[in-house]
């Protein structure tokens, strides 16, 4: 089974994309320079808003989750895993982790990339407040 979830967001001048363990997309519209894992703001969805079918499929320990982040022609693909402990309860944030840590904000674990691994070309685009960013989450179980 393959389920796709699309989240639209935008860039922000304070995007750092330097965190080594996670990356985050948030519904918040403000961002300080301390938010070094945040790669997009103004998202249309938080973890709690994701489709029920997506959540159920991602809660399987053998689920494969692919996250594609696109800004115009520049894109990054991240491969991660599902986990039976995912709760998808946070109303504001979507967090992808390299580790196995799970909380209400977590949408995938065991990722092969974090914010610091994104191309600097993409990061430059993510620093533009007018830049539309498309995040596509695909779960296969």
What is the predicted function of each stretch?
Residues 49, 74-123:
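Short, solvent-exposed interaction modules
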Residues 11-32, 66, 70-97:
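A low-complexity, Ser/Thr/Gly/Pro-enriched, surface-exposed linker/loop concept
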Residues 34-41, 54, 103-109, 123:
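Short, recurring structural edge motifs at helix starts
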Residues 38-79:
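Short, well-structured hydrophobic secondary-structure segments
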Residues 35-37, 61-67, 90-92, 105, ...:
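A generic structural signal for short beta-strands and their flanking turns/coil linkers
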Residues 29-33, 58-59, 99-101, 127:
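Solvent-exposed alpha-helices and their adjacent loops that cap or buttress functional pockets
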Residues 43, 71, 98, 111, ...:
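Short, structured patches in soluble enzyme cores that scaffold and shape functional sites
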Residues 2-6, 12-14, 22, 128-134, ...:
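N-terminal intrinsically disordered, low-complexity segments enriched in P/E/S/T
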